[in-house]
Amino acid sequence: QDLFAQVDAGYEPVKFVFGNVAYSIGITRGIIGAFKTLGRGEIKEFSDIFNKTRHLALERITNEAKKVGANAVVGIETTILPVIGSGLQEMLMLGTASINPALPKDTVTTSDLTPQEMWNLNKIGYAPEKILIGTSVYSLGLVGSITSALKSFVKGEITELSSLIYEARENALAIINKEADAIGADEVVGVKTYVYQLGSGLIEFLAIGTAVKKVQGLTSKSEQLPPQVFTQDWDTFVNTAEFNVGFDLNQGL
């Protein structure tokens, strides 16, 4: 299903590619950040290192595509994984390196849109330019944590937490908008936002979207996608060996 939509949009698959980065906040920045968790607001040191490392994964998947002569990586999926027992995290990006003759040959565009979403954009003359990533790390602060803890005993909004997440969201979105302006994009589409707890009163707000640009004469091959393209996939492999003993094979049937 996905392959049909991708090829019909003009993207011929070449190779499955990935880019990853394992990262740690580090001792020095950790000490600086630890003191700042006593106050409320963004911890710039943490935001900077998270933004830098996550862009490294994007840079590496782009380089993999260049090696095989592709000018696009489509359908990128991003996953953040813990490296068990090490205190580290890994950011992994997986996608399909492809060639689109309608796009410049000397650059590699990236997109985390589904093939169906990309087909729709292609149909109205827009091509993906680049995945945009914006990260903000915020601290609720010692005073805010105590206030929120007390308010958790009663129902209702925790204003301190609401305002903090709102501010972090605005900051992360501002980062991707600034990057979109820098590359001359016309729009940013498919924006997804995530909030994570990092411990020690810290939260990370992550925004991911795709910058797109109008391309003259660009369109999809078919007038519309056939219904089969939207058929749901089935999982044909299940591994429960690591989690269960005596698993009932008839469960769920």
Label for each model-derived stretch:
Residues 2, 58, 80-82, 114-117, ...:
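Sparse, context-dependent recognition of short Cys/His-centered cofactor- or disulfide-binding micro-motifs
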Residues 72-83, 187-197, 219, 224, ...:
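Short, conserved loop-to-beta-strand elements that form functional interface hotspots
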